[in-house]
């Protein structure tokens, strides 16, 4: 039996989960069709998903149709969970991209399609909700060709809310023959030579073109009324082909972790090559660590079943493997889809329990959520001791807050959400703190040079000190101190895009330790940073704005107000296409504004493109002034228990 792994993708409220539930029901995997409104869906299994009617975590189920086993991965539709969607792309053989016939193409739709196109993932476009009042399919077809691709093949016509095929193994419209010829040289040569070409020949060529992601078939339906679902199943089993196995050696990729109500850990793996068997002893990540497979399940017709073996391209589930982490692999390192650019969160907030004694409980719960979703980043601020979480958006914050309360029984409060800025030194500086020169309490001399690097370079660390004079353990301690120092600059944000050179060192052999160098480094670094000053960097987005020509003047005015950098404008009689860069902070709500003033016709698509020096206002990420921070570091070291906040002290260390 052929096995394929299919992603179901869509913008929010396009009916993605409803389509998935109908696929399960129509294929016989379930006895009734789950409804989002009723909270009885199979794929949205979390209580919060059922209650809010949105998908938070990618879920996997399975159907069989026309002799093909299809593992369906239902992904979140909200931008706040884009990291979950990106992980899914790595394991797909194909995708169904769902559009709402009423709302049309949204910014998320285009972002998803562009990624599918870039990664050359075979994709079927399914226009859902054709039963809705006010649907204008002709306008949507034009929108698809304008904003997604010209290489689409409309497989059906819609009459009175029902779908009828116009392209199949037995029949193909004349204009579609020309379409196929324009995309395949072999068919074109036969066509020009007046050779006989049957509908089946055209059909097989279309299958090949779809498999190569050169053509995108478009189907129609209504999940609400089970219209077009069987036709979609036929298209999936025809157009999405399984990859060829290249080896019999085990290669498996861990893409999902979940915990059951009793806390047992389930790890989901895609078997890339070979097979995984019960009681196998397998290697993790080419390391020296081996595990024994003590239990093994797969998904069959919507149910998890115990098996002795899971073969290539299928999904395996292993329970209670505590060492597993998302992204791990078993056996040979797999060749996964490349080219994904991970999007980092641009927001952060402090979180605290309503009851202070439950802080450790919150940290434990967040660690569990991090195991299930590695994009969830949290840390303890080394200065304020606050627990901070990085976020993609407000919806993610609300989901985390609800999960902590309902799943882990701990109520928390989130402080104001801030944009994540960064800092970079303004100029090259050098700073030295000498051994035995008060108030230096450490048996160490350290000199550091800081110099700015081009944006996007990151942190570079070099040493001018020979290992013959100062051995590895001492120098590594300095490097650790530098990395720690970069976590919080003068305004409390990460310091990046700089080179730090370890330029001077002195120690006393009987008493100096690596700890002296590790603990002194942050003081030297901070004083150097104060001497240099910093540029504040803000997150930037690359944008593409597609709007009707009549709205172009307003759009350009808006973009100027948002301090964008317009790189290209191209217009025709009907549409205007604008590209450029815009600060995240000024544009985070603009997609909904575009939809409003263009009456749903405009699309504002964005993706992260790094940081640049801010042109507008910014917020600090600190709770104490800078001199207090230096004092705080000395006191925290436990070397100086009490130190007077005297001007002489600050003068001495500066």
UniProtKB/Swiss-Prot annotation:
Gene3D superfamilies: 3.30.230.10, 3.30.70.240, Elongation Factor G (Translational Gtpase), domain 3, P-loop containing nucleotide triphosphate hydrolases, Translation factors. GO terms for biological process: response to antibiotic; ribosome disassembly; translation. It holds the Pfam family EF-G_D2. Belongs to the TRAFAC class translation factor GTPase superfamily. Classic translation factor GTPase family. TetM/TetO subfamily. Abolishes the inhibitory effect of tetracyclin on protein synthesis by a non-covalent modification of the ribosomes. One of its GO terms (molecular function) is GTPase activity. This is Tetracycline resistance protein TetQ. InterPro entries: EF-G-like_DII, EFG_II, EFG_III/V, EFG_V-like, G_TR_CS, P-loop_NTPase, Ribosomal_Su5_D2-typ_SF, Ribsml_uS5_D2-typ_fold_subgr. Residues 1-244 form the tr-type G domain.
